[in-house]
Amino acid sequence: MANLPPVYIVSTARTPIGSFLGSLSSQTAVQLGSVAIKGAVERAGIKPEDVDEVFFGNVLSAGVGQGPARQCALGAGLPQTVIATTVNKVCASSLKAIILGAQNIMLGTSDIVVAGGTESMSNTPHYLPNLRNGAKYGDQTLVDGVLKDGLTDSFKKDHMGISAELCVDDHDLTREAQDEYAINSYKKAQAATEAGLFTEIVPVEIPGGRGKPAIKVERDDEVKNLNVDKLKAMRPAFKPDGTVTAPNAAPINDGAAAVVLVSEAKLKELNLKPVAKILGWGDAEREPERFTIAPALAIPKAIKHAGLTAEQVEYYEINEAFSAVALANMKILGLNPDQVNVYGGSVAIGHPLGCSGARIVTTLTSVLKERKAKIGAVGICNGGGGASAMVIENLQ
């Protein structure tokens, strides 16, 4: 990227991650996205009218209404002139949104872009297929939108967990290794939470109703839920003889995350303080059923695009769609576990599909600041066979 104009991250913000039907389930994807965008804009020290464009991820858009990104932008108080585009690259949606935002600034189309993503899996509806033709005779079956559009391979019609089991077989991962990884993810997330290290979080206020005071949600729901004995005793979730279980996989969640991106000219003009500089990115695709290890292709592409070597990357955030995903990609890339997901990952924190790519960017900026490190990389797989990755430089 030596010949391309630099792009800076000047703020990060994410909501706490709510459990399925948990603390944030009363809030729509739009409401959560609006909170994240508003928080990011306020932290950046810019005015709402300074924002040129919004790229925002959302996967489970049924019932959300037209243009989720546009709704989130206006809900956050951005002006009606702001351009907004919704991105659906499954789990990588919000990281791809950040990549698109950076590219937009590099092309000179915009100077200030808000990018990220949102998801309320709790509010995803069930579908009644073919009802438009009339229910002529017999039962009508409801289709779960979370499964249909979020967690099922479109080609083989298998649950994502079947792909995780294939990953386990391909890379000789044991049940014990997956369980131990999940336990460590929870413990790291618990330690980071208690130490106040998730500085990217902005609280969500839930109206109390009937004269009751509003409830302020400030912590991730799932982090506290570790039960080691129960985790180790859990039955396989996807195959009778499998090793992937509910607790060694990411849960179903609600949440949103956003970053503010600016050009160098606007950074200087408005005297903004950069959080990080985007150094490079990469996307990759492979067989749909092996999407789990696509980050091992995308991350090296991002590092090469940044003009760096793997040895220069100090910390990684690899999205834990399953414990097996993190284990396999670390194995392929030869990474030291002490470098990866040091505040825990999505197994413990949660995985709202359209939010997670941006969530791991916000967490990485917190890690790099606290550890006084310079270079970090993120990678996230997505259903269909893909992954996206990004490399950033800490400027805090």
UniProtKB/Swiss-Prot annotation:
Residues binding CoA, per UniProt? N227, K230
One Pfam family hit: Thiolase_C
Q: What does this protein do?
A: Acetyl-CoA acetyltransferase; part of the first module of ergosterol biosynthesis pathway that includes the early steps of the pathway, conserved across all eukaryotes, and which results in the formation of mevalonate from acetyl-coenzyme A (acetyl-CoA). ERG10B catalyzes the formation of acetoacetyl-CoA from acetyl-CoA. The first module starts with the action of the cytosolic acetyl-CoA acetyltransferase ERG10B that catalyzes the formation of acetoacetyl-CoA. The hydroxymethylglutaryl-CoA synthases ERG13 then condenses acetyl-CoA with acetoacetyl-CoA to form HMG-CoA.
In Swiss-Prot or TrEMBL terms, this protein is called Acetyl-CoA acetyltransferase ERG10, cytosolic
Active-site feature positions = C91 (acyl-thioester intermediate), H351 (proton acceptor), C381 (proton acceptor)
Q: Which reaction does it catalyse?
A: 2 acetyl-CoA = acetoacetyl-CoA + CoA
State the superkingdom. Answer: Eukaryota
Cofactor(s) named in the record: K(+)
What are the GO BP annotations of this UniProt entry? ergosterol biosynthetic process; fatty acid beta-oxidation
InterPro entries listed in its UniProt record: Thiolase, Thiolase-like, Thiolase_acyl_enz_int_AS, Thiolase_AS, Thiolase_C, Thiolase_CS, Thiolase_N
The record, for Gene3D superfamilies, names: 3.40.47.10
